[in-house]
């Protein structure tokens, strides 16, 4: 079992990272919060969850243990798989997610693509007590996102659309949503654009 992967960042997008460990490249699925935490760094340490299925062996990586713990709690809920959990952790920071669950804010949770009211309520019912008793001080990994310098508009557009298609959205509606957001907020960093797009798609 892999606890963490530490190495140089060979490739990085808002949805995936390739970590080079002594010449071996690990492709890791990441959330937007983790992307914010490691963007601009030459190396990083990601805490790993291994999803082993008959047809695939997938790694999910997190910048800290708290986000991984939240991910594990989310996938323990019936109907929530790895990609849906990652999408929740891309739309909401760890601190926001803990707050949403502890305050039973199902309406906020169902703004995440793919989460209906019933699923949102199930997440809250199943995890409310676990959040309170777990080690959930919830430092928001994505808190530094707002401090990032605005990237080139075209580059932000390209990265955001690529990340959304990696998350399973069709290219055309992704492009439409991203362009609309950048028209409203031309200097928005890619993380913010993706978060806003996740609520519109």
Swiss-Prot record:
Main location: cytoplasm
One GO cellular component, as annotated: Holliday junction resolvase complex
Region (Domain II): 64-142
UniProt-annotated stretches for the region Domain III: 153-201
Disulfide bonds: none
Gene3D superfamilies found in the cross-reference section: 5' to 3' exonuclease, C-terminal subdomain, DNA helicase RuvA subunit, C-terminal domain, Nucleic acid-binding proteins
Molecular functions (GO terms): ATP binding; four-way junction DNA binding; four-way junction helicase activity
GO annotation terms (biological process): DNA recombination; DNA repair
Keywords (A to Z) from UniProt: Cytoplasm, DNA damage, DNA recombination, DNA repair, DNA-binding
InterPro entries with a match to the protein in the record: DNA_helicase_Holl-junc_RuvA_I, Hlx-hairpin-Hlx_DNA-bd_motif, NA-bd_OB-fold, RuvA, RuvA_2-like, RuvA_C, RuvA_C_sf
Domain I, as annotated region: 1-63
Subcellular location: Cytoplasm
SUPFAM superfamilies per the UniProt record, alphabetical: DNA helicase RuvA subunit, C-terminal domain, Nucleic acid-binding proteins, RuvA domain 2-like
Segments for region (Flexible linker): 143-153
Described function: The RuvA-RuvB-RuvC complex processes Holliday junction (HJ) DNA during genetic recombination and DNA repair, while the RuvA-RuvB complex plays an important role in the rescue of blocked DNA replication forks via replication fork reversal (RFR). RuvA specifically binds to HJ cruciform DNA, conferring on it an open structure. The RuvB hexamer acts as an ATP-dependent pump, pulling dsDNA into and through the RuvAB complex. HJ branch migration allows RuvC to scan DNA until it finds its consensus sequence, where it cleaves and resolves the cruciform DNA.
UniProt family annotation: Belongs to the RuvA family.
NCBIfam families, alphabetized: ruvA (TIGR00084)
Record note on quaternary structure: Homotetramer. Forms an RuvA(8)-RuvB(12)-Holliday junction (HJ) complex. HJ DNA is sandwiched between 2 RuvA tetramers; dsDNA enters through RuvA and exits via RuvB. An RuvB hexamer assembles on each DNA strand where it exits the tetramer. Each RuvB hexamer is contacted by two RuvA subunits (via domain III) on 2 adjacent RuvB subunits; this complex drives branch migration. In the full resolvosome a probable DNA-RuvA(4)-RuvB(12)-RuvC(2) complex forms which resolves the HJ.
Domain notes: Has three domains with a flexible linker between the domains II and III and assumes an 'L' shape. Domain III is highly mobile and contacts RuvB.
UniProt cross-references to HAMAP family, sorted A to Z: DNA_HJ_migration_RuvA (MF_00031)
Name of the protein described by the UniProt record: Holliday junction branch migration complex subunit RuvA
Species in which this protein is naturally found: Bacteroides fragilis (strain ATCC 25285 / DSM 2151 / CCUG 4856 / JCM 11019 / LMG 10263 / NCTC 9343 / Onslow / VPI 2553 / EN-2)
Encoding gene per record: ruvA
